């Protein structure tokens, strides 16, 4: 009976992960919207954001919304390199409401989570983890948002994990940010996302199976 129950749990979890899709096709900005006057363009298969004449905040947001997902991407910071990856966020002009995983120069909390126009910094990485950032080289970031829980990784190292009810209720898309101030240039590539479906149903089914197991053992 125990072996059967374990198999059922594994099957339940396996159907929750959908096929990985490319959010950036390496050729153009199809599927994305430019917000603000900063520069967003494609060059040699890379997505580039660069400060424009207004030196203001700018965002490139997905047209589609994503709730539960695993997002992987690569970024390379040139010049100042102050940027970020927003999730479950909505953008109107240069006003974004939602949550940002920080992408910043050394000692400025890359991998931490910030709530825009709300509570501000929710969690910052341990300063010792700053060593994992490779300024001026390609870095790999992974963000897993599943219900109330968000976990971030930088170059294979877990940076932070937070459980937050407000984040769990958030709705919106993915957005890349370029910070205000001018002199910023960041490159992006290999932006891939897997949607995580049936999050609640999966765990409810596991609870039911556990209940069945407890009933059968007494």
Language-model features: locations:
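Sec-dependent N-terminal signal peptides
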Residues: 4-13
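Carbohydrate-interacting regions of secretory-pathway proteins
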Residues: 19-209
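Short, intrinsically disordered C-terminal tails of secreted or membrane-associated proteins
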Residues: 214-217
């Amino acid at each position: 009976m125990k072996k059967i129950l374990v198999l059922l749990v594994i099957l339940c979890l396996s159907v929750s992960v959908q096929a990985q899709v490319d959010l950036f096709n390496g050729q153009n900005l199809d599927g994305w919207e430019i917000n603000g006057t900063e520069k967003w363009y494609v060059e040699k298969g890379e997505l580039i954001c660069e400060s424009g004449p207004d030196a203001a905040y700018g965002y490139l947001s997905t047209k589609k919304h994503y709730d539960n997902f695993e997002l992987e991407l690569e970024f390379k910071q040139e010049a100042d390199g102050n940027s970020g990856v927003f999730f479950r966020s909505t953008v109107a002009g240069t006003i974004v409401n939602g949550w940002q995983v920080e992408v910043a120069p050394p000692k400025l909390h890359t991998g931490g989570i910030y709530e825009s126009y709300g509570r501000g910094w929710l969690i910052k990485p341990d300063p010792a983890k700053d060593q994992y950032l490779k300024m001026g080289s390609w870095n790999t970031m992974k963000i897993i948002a599943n219900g109330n829980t968000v976990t971030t990784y930088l170059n294979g190292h877990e940076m932070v994990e937070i459980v937050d009810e407000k984040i769990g209720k958030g709705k919106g898309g993915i957005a890349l940010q370029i910070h205000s101030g001018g002199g910023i240039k960041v490159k992006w590539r290999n932006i891939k996302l897997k949607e995580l479906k049936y999050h609640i149903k999966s765990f409810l089914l596991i609870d039911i199976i556990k209940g069945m197991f407890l009933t059968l053992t007494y």
